[in-house]
Structures are given as C-alpha cells and as structure tokens.
C-alpha cells in the first residue's frame, strides 16, 4: 500500500505543480497506469481528469473519421451535423490535425448552434504546438467562431514548455506528462510498540 500511496502522492504533487504554472486549465489524458486512481490523484492536485471512461463524453478522433463513408472535411461536416448531442455525455470533442479541419468543424458547429441550443464543441488541436495554436485561435476569433468552441491543445506538451503556451489563447492543455513517468513521493511507515 505504501508504493501505491507514494505513486499517487507523486502524481497529485506533479499535477499541483502543473496546475500552478500552467496558463490555463491542464488535463490528464486517458493514458494512466492505475486508471481511476491516477485520475483521482490528478484531480486532488488541481488538474482536470478529462474523461474517466469513454462513456463520460464523446471524443471523435482521426481514426473515427477515417472509418466513415466520407473522408476528411466531409466526414467532419457529416458527423457534426447529425450527432445527437443528448447522447454525447458531458461534452463532445473533435480532434483535428490541421487548420482547415478546425475551421470546418467550428463553422459547422456554429451553424448548428444558430438553430439549436447546443453547448460549445471541444476542439482538440493535436500536435499544433504553441505558435500554430495561437494562430488558430486568432483565426477562429477573426472569423467569429471562437465562442462556439472550447480549444484544447494536446500532443507533446511538456512542463518545460508551459511558458510558451501562456499567450496562445487555448482553454485547456491536455497531456499524459502529468501522471505518466511521475516520480513517487518517498513514503514510509513506522509502527510504535
């Protein structure tokens, strides 16, 4: 039990370190060793847990788009136009790997919001980096689309680069670095007689 406590305490401490320094909210990804225990430790440290399991929210990743009848932007439009939001859980998230897909997704979602009462779409910018993310946020703002989306940056986000993310304008940074490879705290137990 000491090993488990040490590991989870290390994750909570690391999450607190990230949450204190990060310019915005920081979330753990699905990549955990101890599952819900890792997620709870991240939560205790001040980070977001993202999804605890797949049923908590709907996340559409590039592999999901690849197996649809349409391809690329057509698949994004088709999915976002017809998705039953009441079945999505806490939120609906779409992973995009390029600027065109991000704009198509935000435009499609905004058009749907104009005729339906819908929450913001979570738009995950995968491997965009701080500079590209900042340009994307600016472009979405200039196009009047920014209010329709929550922007999450993910992919290769490390603690040493947090300062570079400060001015990019994303809402959430998600990374497995919060909980994976975290050094455990040195916990010991003494029994008095």
Could you describe each region identified by the protein language model?
Residues 1-120, 131-135, 139, 150-152, ...:
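Acidic/glycine-rich phosphate/pyrophosphate-binding loops and surrounding catalytic core
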Residues 99, 128, 158:
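Short, polar loop motifs at secondary-structure junctions
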Residues 147:
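His-Asp phosphorelay/catalytic-motif detector in bacterial-type signaling
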Residues 127, 155, 177:
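Short secondary-structure boundary segments
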Residues 140, 158-159:
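Catalytic-pocket segment enriched in acidic/His residues
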């Amino acid at each position: 039990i000491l090993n488990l406590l040490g590991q989870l305490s290390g994750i909570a401490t690391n999450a607190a370190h990230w949450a204190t320094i990060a310019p915005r909210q920081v979330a753990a990804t699905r990549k955990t060793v101890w599952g819900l225990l890792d997620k709870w430790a991240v939560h205790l440290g001040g980070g977001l847990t993202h999804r605890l399991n797949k049923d908590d929210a709907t996340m559409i990743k590039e592999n999901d788009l690849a197996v649809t009848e349409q391809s690329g932007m057509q698949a994004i439009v088709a999915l976002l136009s017809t998705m039953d939001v009441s079945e999505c859980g806490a939120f609906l998230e779409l992973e995009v790997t390029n600027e065109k897909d991000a704009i198509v997704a935000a435009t499609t979602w905004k058009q749907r919001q104009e005729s339906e009462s819908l929450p913001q779409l979570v738009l995950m910018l995968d491997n965009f980096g701080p500079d590209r993310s900042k340009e994307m946020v600016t472009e979405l703002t200039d196009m009047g689309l920014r209010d329709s989306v929550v922007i999450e940056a993910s992919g290769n986000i490390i603690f040493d680069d947090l300062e570079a993310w400060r001015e990019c304008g994303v809402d959430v940074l998600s990374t497995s670095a919060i909980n994976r490879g975290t050094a455990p705290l040195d916990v010991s137990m003494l029994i008095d007689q």
